[in-house]
Regions:
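Active-site-proximal alpha-helical segments within enzyme catalytic domains
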Residues: 229-236, 277-300
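Long, well-ordered core segments of solenoidal/helical folds
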Residues: 252-262, 312-323
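Short, charged, amphipathic alpha-helices and their helix-cap/turn boundaries
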Residues: 109-112, 154-155, 189-219, 243-262
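N-terminal leader/targeting segments and the immediately adjacent pre-domain N-terminus
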Residues: 2-118, 145-146
Length: 334
């Protein structure tokens, strides 16, 4: 029976350590943050719809509607041949696809929804939000709110330089390139202090981005995925424009490209009210297609230049020096 007592002692010590561990995290961060982390699960398509408060983007007063020229059987045949599958719709359904739309010459040729979704279903951008972040920065440069993406980030976030003078060497461009030299470790020895949970679940993303970012390398040397970058870009947008990210998105993008439906930015919390810049833009699939159309047309929408063609060109050309072909100025190459 001694082994049972030993097991009981070990379990009791483990539980006590766990309780202390959770308690320390609740004091250092907040009880709400600890609850968010402990209740987190594998990523789901609804995470940024159900798990966070939302700030609405209203449908455009002048909605743009794609024409229809459906040729779904031809599209299915092309993809079935290309992917080597016998049933393209089943392939999409089995892959947990929510929606799949093909548009050619401004006309919808294929539009199907899967797994309980339809045209009215709101879906989350996930990292496509970073491409929207980039466009918003480009528009802010066009409008003169941001003088240049080669400005030091401390021109807009001077408190960073107070904490570490080396922040003066980091530019807005470095944030867009994910090449700032800032430390980012998805998980650390303590469940609650990894950068992934902090940038996902912490209830004040402005605070954590200003106080928990540390320089470990010189900027521009290499690409390193880092979710503090889009958060800092969001703060720069706020400071430079005097608007919330949602308001700037609404007036400079949503209204101008004729979004048919309401959308929403997920927020870190009601109290902080800061948009989750790394992944938290929600919209209907057909409206996300309009963002793609904007860039296909060099930033022009129905005769109006929404974002400069110079920005579109620069933000979609890969810089081989970064050794990463997937990101340039926060645009993801597919």
């Amino acid at each position: 029976m001694k082994w049972l007592r030993r097991v009981g002692v070990v379990l009791a010590v483990f539980v006590a350590v766990l309780v202390v561990w959770v308690g320390v995290a609740a004091v250092v961060y907040s009880p709400e943050y600890v609850i968010r982390v402990l209740s987190s699960r594998e990523s789901e398509v609804s995470d940024y719809l159900d798990g966070f408060p939302l700030r609405t983007l209203a449908a455009s007063p002048e909605p743009y509607t794609f024409a229809e020229d459906l040729d779904e059987d031809r599209v299915r045949g092309l993809f079935e041949a290309g992917f080597g599958v016998s049933d393209f719709d089943a392939f999409l359904r089995d892959g947990d696809t929510t929606s799949f739309i093909v548009i050619k010459d401004d006309a919808v040729v294929y539009e199907e929804y899967f797994n309980g979704n339809d045209r009215e279903s709101m879906v989350t951008s996930f990292s496509v939000a970073k491409s929207v972040d980039s466009a918003l920065i480009g528009i802010a440069v066009d409008e003169g709110f941001i003088e240049s993406i080669d400005d030091p980030v401390t021109d807009y976030l001077p408190e960073l330089a107070v904490r570490d003078d080396r922040f003066r060497a980091i530019t807005v461009r470095d944030l867009l390139l994910m090449a700032s030299g800032l430390d980012y470790q998805e998980m650390r020895w303590f469940l609650f202090n990894g950068d992934d949970p902090l940038t996902t679940y912490y209830l004040d993303q402005r605070d954590i981005s200003l106080t928990n970012t540390n320089i470990v390398d010189s900027p521009t040397e290499y690409f390193h995925y880092n979710k503090y970058h889009p958060q800092l870009l969001g703060m720069i947008l706020e400071r430079a424009t005097g608007m919330s990210v949602t308001e700037y998105t609404q007036t400079r993008l949503w209204d101008r490209i004729g979004m048919e439906y309401d959308g929403a930015w997920a927020l870190d919390s009601v109290e902080s009210g800061f948009e989750k810049m790394e992944a938290g833009l929600n919209a209907r699939a057909i409206d996300f297609a309009k963002f793609g159309r904007l860039f296909l047309n060099g930033g022009e929408w129905e005769g109006a230049q929404v974002v400069s063609d110079e920005w579109v060109a620069e933000s979609t050309v890969v810089d081989p020096a970064l050794h990463n072909p997937d990101y340039y100025l926060s645009l993801i190459h597919i």
